[in-house]
Amino acid sequence: VAKGSVRGGLLLGLAVVVALAATGVWNPFPGLWDWVDRSEPISEPDVVWQVRVGGTPRSVTIAGDTVVVEQRTRVEARSLATGTQLWERKADWSAVAGGDRDPVVAVGKLLVKGYELLDPATGVTRRRDDDAVAVWTYRNLLLDAHCTDATDCTLSAWDPRGTAPLWTAFLPGVSSGLLADNPGLRGTRRLTATRIDDRVAGPESVPPLLGFPVDGRVHVVDTATGRVLQNVEPGRDERLSVVGGRMLRIAARSQDGTCYFAISARDPATGQEAWQRAGVNLRTADSAGCAQREDPQGARNVLIGVGPDGREAVIDGYDGRLLWVGEPGTKLIAVDDRYALFRAADKRSVVARELGTDRVLWTRPVSGKAGAALTPYAAVIGDEKPSRLVAVDPRSGRELAVLRTPANALAVGPQGMIVGEGREIGYVRFGATGGGPAPPPGNGGTPGPGGNGPNSEDDDNCGPKRELCPDPAGGKDG
């Protein structure tokens, strides 16, 4: 009898609560759900803000004072200062172009021609295109392609916020794929790291030359003028790549049970050989044989190769110089035009070197599984046991942020970075746990590959030796 009374009382109480909730007199469920759904802090120390977005992010980009979050069927922008949602749009793909002061967001639909350029702060359409089949986004340029048929395409270059093309060029086709944003070109393949997104650095400055693959050939386009410099067909054992203002012909020949590699770098304007190296493996072939199915590893104007002795090296794509050669047992984990980060042979530390010099910039203790990425504003290191994300000044090693977190590094900007786990994302401001932020690119003091003088952001587009820009004094190029 007692058990029946208790059960009856509970049922009566539940019925009363449901009746009160249904009539709007009192509803405990929203508060209860808020308590159940409350997010745990994504890191320690805590982030400036933390929000749960509608779906798992496909990419996250800091665009000026906003954060652009691409999801599977939508894109949204949030305030960098507060995390508040500014706008949301249905879209199957999105990509950010422009720099810190002039960003735009390109959005489009799956298998549908055209795109819109949105203002990241308001979501307002700045420019609309109804016919483009592909879009490439850079820090200082946006490219799109229109095709009247499969073999008749026009490549157009735009200032990110421009209203008229800067130049146009003819291409006999474009490889676009299902999603139109940034189809693959013949350049370099970046090093990757677990817990650090491949696009953490955001859009880069457009290289001086781009290689467009069309029907087995590579068309080399000068991005300053739109001139098509070469239309090259690779040999049977070759792979073509455009790096550092050069056309690379990478040969892999099978003999005696191994692969023999040779690199010939040519000036696309003249076709003459600029440099060559034999015996360097750029990791273009898989382990099953010598068939080259991948772009060479590298970043912007530099290449990553492995010598016959098994040591890794960083090579200047323009003149073929060895900018860094690792010691036996060291492992390169991140590289750009300025620096190389490698894991020491003892697997207990990460070492930063300035390319083209013997100077060690800094050393930091890590575990044997640590990964890293270099961005214009910070070097990001992801470590395990304990699980940490660390951002440091790439030149000095000064700590900008140190987080105890299982989250991933999704995007890095001038003043901080976005971290995320699942649908949760949060903003970490640099300086909260360390020094101030690194200077943005273009403020001087940033050498090109193996260089020792300051480069502006415009200089980044001139090639490592300014080979594609005129001498401001009116002299010879160089």
Predicted regions: what they are:
Residues 1-478:
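Secretory-pathway ectodomains
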